[in-house]
């Protein structure tokens, strides 16, 4: 069985590849655990200057493996995937991070891309957060990330509708830094990573820390009530119905409970 998370390092650039193309790189628990370990390892390597995150095949990442998630919930394991912890590790990485987004970046895949410092997309790139269609809520940390990146009104439209945003619209909103032809994506990302890697690492790391600290200061607020609301939605009957409907390929019937 092939490894589902690949890691290579060359010329100071660490490339992390989601390698489950037959499942559109949907993240199962083992992949999330491996991502967490990989990002932790990369953060500790002084010879790494840049981290690139990409997906094998035509899709960046379709989000969490919903079949696995539904099975876990049926077994009473409400939250075992650890994606938020893995993304926190990615965001805390002192090295600049770049997402190479080809095709869909859906739900957890959108989160993964947004937790990278820079995002380069192919002309096939699409971003979507269709969690309301599953009866679940977006993690609070991602809500902040979206508002910081694209503003409150576009965030509300993205979350309320669950509709996908194409590459050019994503560029306009700020979800992407650049859009290139699919055939050029790998070359452009490599060139960008090399430009960053050639700069003074202490300088780049310091400036990344400056930008992140400013964002953290804006987020300092009481959020106990928001965490409680997130748990309420996550554990609701609607959330169970949404996942069941997805698995059974039918339209969900939400009752607001």
Where are these regions (language model features)?
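Glycine- (often His-adjacent) and acidic-residue-rich active-site loop
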Residues: 33, 55-89, 105, 133-135, ...
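Terminal peptide-recognition signature
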Residues: 16, 20, 35, 53, ...
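Charged catalytic carboxylate motif
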Residues: 30, 34, 82, 89, ...
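Crotonase-fold acyl-CoA enzyme core
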Residues: 88-202, 235-236, 240, 244, ...
